[in-house]
């Protein structure tokens, strides 16, 4: 219910606001802390921590303190993955892997493929099929994100048409802000 950037407020100041649901209705819920989200999610879901503006050291300290078991860490390069892996050997990753050079960097850094899901971009590209094949040979699922593309369409009809077009390119995982819109779509294409 607030206005402006979250980063312009302290956490205490943010507690005066309530969260709004996807239909624009004000709820009774407040903005939770990451620790509260981790506690709530235990036994319910897996959280993908894609934290862009927090130093690696801060996240590593948090990981060592909280020891979350239901978390996947989004990393943008092999160095970040190695940093977390050295502190939490069983860490699971969503690794940005959009080309063969990035794939090779993860290999050289010794990141275990069994602990990786690869974010390959906003869509599957035919020219990157050799990369997808290499990932699949290593047991890695390829994930795309429609958040920056089809999720921004104005209507639900436009969103679902975009989703269906991406399904036909055969990604293993589709990240979206609107998972409920996938109900009823043909996921077999």
Predicted regions: what they are:
Residues 1-43:
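An active-site metal/cofactor-coordinating segment within enzyme catalytic domains
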Residues 6-8, 39-42, 65-66, 86-88, ...:
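Extracellular/periplasmic catalytic domains that process cell-envelope and extracellular macromolecules
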Residues 10, 18, 51-55, 77, ...:
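A mature extracytoplasmic/lumenal domain signature
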Residues 14, 37, 49, 166, ...:
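Conserved, mostly hydrophobic/aromatic
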Residues 18, 41, 63-67, 88, ...:
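Sec/Tat-exported extracytoplasmic proteins
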Residues 24-28, 96-97, 103-189:
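C-terminal active-site rim and adjoining tail of enzyme catalytic domains
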Residues 42-47, 67-72, 89-91, 114-116, ...:
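Short, well-ordered coil/turn segments that N-cap beta-strands
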Residues 55-65, 81-95, 99-110:
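Distinct, well-ordered alpha-helical segments
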């Amino acid at each position: 219910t607030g206005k402006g950037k979250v980063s312009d407020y302290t956490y205490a100041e943010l507690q005066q606001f309530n969260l709004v649901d996807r239909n624009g209705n004000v709820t009774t819920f407040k903005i939770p802390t990451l620790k509260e989200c981790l506690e709530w999610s235990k036994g319910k879901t897996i959280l993908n921590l894609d934290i862009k503006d927090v130093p690696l050291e801060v996240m590593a300290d948090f990981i060592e303190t909280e020891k979350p078991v239901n978390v996947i860490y989004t990393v943008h390069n092999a160095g970040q993955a190695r940093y977390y892996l050295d502190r939490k050997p069983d860490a699971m990753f969503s690794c940005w892997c959009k080309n063969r050079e990035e794939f090779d960097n993860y290999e050289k850094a010794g990141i275990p493929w069994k602990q990786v899901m690869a974010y390959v971009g906003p869509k599957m590209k035919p020219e990157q099929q050799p990369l997808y094949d290499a990932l699949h040979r290593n047991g890695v699922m390829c994930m795309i994100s429609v958040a920056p593309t089809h999720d921004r369409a104005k209507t639900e009809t436009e969103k679902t048409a975009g989703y269906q077009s991406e399904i036909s390119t055969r990604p293993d995982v589709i990240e979206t802000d609107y998972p409920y819109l996938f109900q009823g779509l043909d996921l077999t294409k």
